[in-house]
């Protein structure tokens, strides 16, 4: 455990940041999960709406450094690809 007052303060701040960042990561996963559920249910409109809601959240968390920018891009790309495939299957 930290001995000096400044080290104790830094430990407290680090714990606060850790729990807040965990909450934000959980929120991103929930938004992604909502898109995946809509895709699995083959509900194109709901999937598009969920994706539209998820993209700004994913981008914001990437800007804040909660998730890596490449991971954010990968999630958006894959989700959008699944939605496009769902739309093409519905059109055919």
Curated annotation (Swiss-Prot):
| GO MF annotation list | small ribosomal subunit rRNA binding; structural constituent of ribosome
Q: Where is this region: Disordered?
A: 1-23
The record's annotation in Pfam families points to: Ribosomal_S20p (PF01649)
Q: Which GO terms describe its biological process?
A: translation
| InterPro entries recorded | Ribosomal_bS20, Ribosomal_bS20_sf
Record GO cellular component, one term: cytosol
Q: What keywords tag this UniProt record?
A: Ribonucleoprotein, Ribosomal protein, RNA-binding, rRNA-binding
What's this protein's family per the entry? Belongs to the bacterial ribosomal protein bS20 family.
- Its biological function? Binds directly to 16S ribosomal RNA.
Tell me the protein's name: Small ribosomal subunit protein bS20
Organism source for this protein? Stutzerimonas stutzeri (strain A1501) (Pseudomonas stutzeri)
Q: What is the lineage of its organism?
A: Bacteria, Pseudomonadati, Pseudomonadota, Gammaproteobacteria, Pseudomonadales
Question: Corresponding gene?
Answer: rpsT
């Amino acid at each position: 455990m930290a001995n000096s007052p400044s080290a104790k303060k830094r430990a407290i701040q680090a714990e606060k940041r850790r729990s807040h960042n965990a909450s934000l990561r959980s929120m991103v996963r929930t938004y992604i999960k909502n898109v995946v559920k809509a895709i699995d249910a083959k509900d194109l409109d709901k999937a598009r709406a969920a994706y539209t809601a998820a993209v700004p959240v994913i981008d914001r968390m990437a800007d804040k450094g909660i998730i890596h920018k490449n991971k954010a891009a990968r999630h958006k790309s894959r989700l959008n690809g699944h939605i496009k495939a769902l739309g093409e299957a519905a059109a055919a």
